[in-house]
Curated annotation (Swiss-Prot):
It comes from Drosophila melanogaster. InterPro entries: ADT_euk_type (IPR002113), Mit_carrier (IPR002067), Mitochondrial_sb/sol_carrier (IPR018108), Mt_carrier_dom_sf (IPR023395). The keyword Transport applies. This is ADP,ATP carrier protein. ADP:ATP antiporter that mediates import of ADP into the mitochondrial matrix for ATP synthesis, and export of ATP out to fuel the cell. Cycles between the cytoplasmic-open state (c-state) and the matrix-open state (m-state): operates by the alternating access mechanism with a single substrate-binding site intermittently exposed to either the cytosolic (c-state) or matrix (m-state) side of the inner mitochondrial membrane. Keywords: Antiport, Membrane, Mitochondrion, Mitochondrion inner membrane, Repeat, Transmembrane, Transmembrane helix, Transport.
Length: 312
């Protein structure tokens, strides 16, 4: 009973200590920096997605598939127009604003739970594990709320049609069409493997970044180039480690809206097995180099977030 009472008292105290202003600042700083960076790297993002899903796209025949990142960059403006590089970007910004903002905001709240009373100087491994846990939990929580928008972004970016040949005319049309054909399940296809991937990615993304910065003598006054270097390494490593999960979830997303006879993967496990068997393990990393370049935007988000918080 004593432990239960102590737990309740601790939770009550945490509720009273909740900083509403700080929460809003976290939300605003994370959202603004994310929206700016995602728009800047949108062309790379679209190339990466096309390389990931073209193998099962109904719009891209085997002889029309992109040979690689450079080929994709050259052909997109020729075949679909220059502005098509930003196809799906609006959905991405709308999705990314709450996603990143919630990630950053809840990350700090989870840190209160996992890192309360932990001394980083004398309890390094507990501090490290707490950062991993808070980062992973924040990412998974956010994903539950915004997955349909992530789904729509993927389908819009994968749409290679031009004019009347496009599969979807926009965000609303995409969500409506899939909901009518597949129901809410269609909008959450690939959710399971997404949660697995997001936990791995966010755990590394936030965990290693916060741990590295926490080990610096004066984290708040760290030169921006050092913060940038740390962020760049973190986003690259996290992206490569979780990339196969991302490829599988994108492939699963591409199946929504298809007739039963056109469905390629029975479930997530079948998707993993089929890709490995038919395309080889290298297929799990298609577009990975584009993802590393895109990671520059992710590193920019982390650094810009810290800078905006200083202003706010």
């Amino acid at each position: 009973m004593g432990n239960i009472s102590a737990s309740i008292t601790s939770q009550s105290k945490m509720g009273k200590d909740f900083d509403a202003v700080g929460f809003v600042k976290d939300f605003a700083a994370g959202g603004i920096s994310a929206a700016v960076s995602k728009t800047a790297v949108a062309p790379i993002e679209r190339v990466k997605l096309l390389l990931q899903v073209q193998h099962i796209s109904k719009q891209i025949s085997p002889d029309k598939q992109y040979k690689g990142m450079v080929d994709c960059f050259i052909r997109i403006p020729k075949e679909q127009g220059f502005s098509s590089f930003w196809r799906g970007n609006l959905a991405n910004v709308i999705r990314y604003f709450p996603t990143q903002a919630l990630n950053f905001a809840f990350k700090d709240k989870y840190k209160q739970v996992f890192l309360g009373g932990v001394d980083k100087n004398t309890q390094f491994w507990r501090y490290f594990a707490g950062n991993l846990a808070s980062g992973g939990a924040a990412g998974a929580t956010s994903l539950c709320f915004v997955y349909p928008l992530d789904f729509a972004r993927t389908r819009l970016a994968a749409d290679t049609g031009k004019g009347g040949q496009r599969e979807f005319t926009g965000l609303g049309n995409c969500l409506t069409k899939i909901f009518k054909s597949d129901g809410i399940v269609g909008l959450y296809r690939g959710f399971g493997v997404s949660v697995q991937g997001i936990i791995i990615y966010r755990a590394a993304y936030f965990g290693f970044y916060d741990t590295a910065r926490g080990m610096l003598p004066d984290p708040k006054n760290t030169p921006i180039y050092i913060s940038w270097a740390i962020a760049q390494v973190v986003t690259t490593v996290a992206g490569i480690v979780s990339y196969p999960f991302d490829t599988v979830r994108r492939r699963m997303m591409m199946q929504s809206g298809r007739k039963a006879t056109e469905v390629i993967y029975k479930n997530t496990l079948h998707c993993w097995a089929t890709i490995a068997k038919q395309e080889g393990t290298g297929a799990f990393f298609k577009g990975a180099f584009s993802n590393i370049l895109r990671g520059t935007g992710g590193a920019f988000v982390l650094v810009l977030y810290d800078e905006i918080k200083k202003v706010l």
